[in-house]
């Protein structure tokens, strides 16, 4: 097993803390809480911490550049640790997945997600692993207000179960590789018992 940069995308500040667009930050916060890890070291234009799993150290990164400039932070971390882009795992919200689903994917486009766009612009390509946290699409209205809006209380109540499912996926990915994790988890809805 080798080191990874696990970057959760979001916007800094209490105003954005519980918004749909901060699913990546919320994911890393849940991991840090459950694993008793601190993500508070100021580095790489973000907040960083270390998580050890199966005798391997992984860097947890919450860019503090705002979403549209997340690529700068991810690039700095990869360069510092001399890791290829394939060792980056980016956790982000995804409008195209229904709430309650989490999927793994390697490569692809940015799908209009400004954080992914920034990473691809900074690094020249999109060949990194994505852990996509489904937030669903708004029934009406524009997507900007939707992603920057807070989750309703009924979704907030369910969020830990979804994030815990995503953590299971991440652990499987790190322990047994992407194909195995995708085959076991990509068709699962974490709201179903």
Swiss-Prot record:
Pfam families: Pept_tRNA_hydro (PF01195). Its EC number is 3.1.1.29. The keyword tRNA-binding applies. It is an enzyme of class 3 (hydrolase). TRNA binds at residues 16, 66, 68, 114. Keywords: Cytoplasm, Hydrolase, RNA-binding, tRNA-binding. The record marks 93 as: Stabilizes the basic form of H active site to accept a proton. InterPro entries: Pept_tRNA_hydro (IPR001328), Pept_tRNA_hydro_CS (IPR018171), Pept_tRNA_hydro_sf (IPR036416). It catalyses: an N-acyl-L-alpha-aminoacyl-tRNA + H2O = an N-acyl-L-amino acid + a tRNA + H(+). It is found in: Cytoplasm. One of its GO terms (molecular function) is tRNA binding. It comes from the Bacteria. The record marks 11 as: Discriminates between blocked and unblocked aminoacyl-tRNA. GO terms for biological process: protein quality control for misfolded or incompletely synthesized proteins; rescue of stalled ribosome. The active site is at 21 (proton acceptor). GO terms for cellular component: cytoplasm. Monomer. HAMAP family: Pept_tRNA_hydro_bact. Belongs to the PTH family. Hydrolyzes ribosome-free peptidyl-tRNAs (with 1 or more amino acids incorporated), which drop off the ribosome during protein synthesis, or as a result of ribosome stalling. Catalyzes the release of premature peptidyl moieties from peptidyl-tRNA molecules trapped in stalled 50S ribosomal subunits, and thus maintains levels of free tRNAs and 50S ribosomes. This is Peptidyl-tRNA hydrolase. The gene is pth.
